[in-house]
């Protein structure tokens, strides 16, 4: 039974929980709880359909704009889950004749998105950018997408985004970094 999202109590002993995604401890933040209650009173619990059908609201649009401003980006697109985001984004970026070169320890959603995209899918040894470069050099087609987590959720390793960016530019490849476990 959770005492908070960062620990669990089993047989009267408290243990650290590694199953939480509440990295910033916002789940029990009083300000967020208050804002959520106000939003529930104003908008109800559900839009009763997905954004694709009729569930996209002015609040969703406002959130996208605020995230874009925070990140200094032109646009933001909300997805219901990180898993869906990875599937949707990867499929939008590659076609069947393209190459995906991905870190071996990427999150399952990145692996599934890569496989489901039907692009040529290759994996390089974890955080081994020389291996990445060897694989890119063997790719026959021009359009390559390099994919990596920034923070690997299962072991806490951090990708070297600067090196990945340099390799991507050098080989005229696109780069997709999943920030789900770092930025959130």
Question: What function would you assign to each model-found segment?
Answer:
Residues 81, 101-117:
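Substrate-binding/gating loop at the entrance of the active-site cleft, primarily
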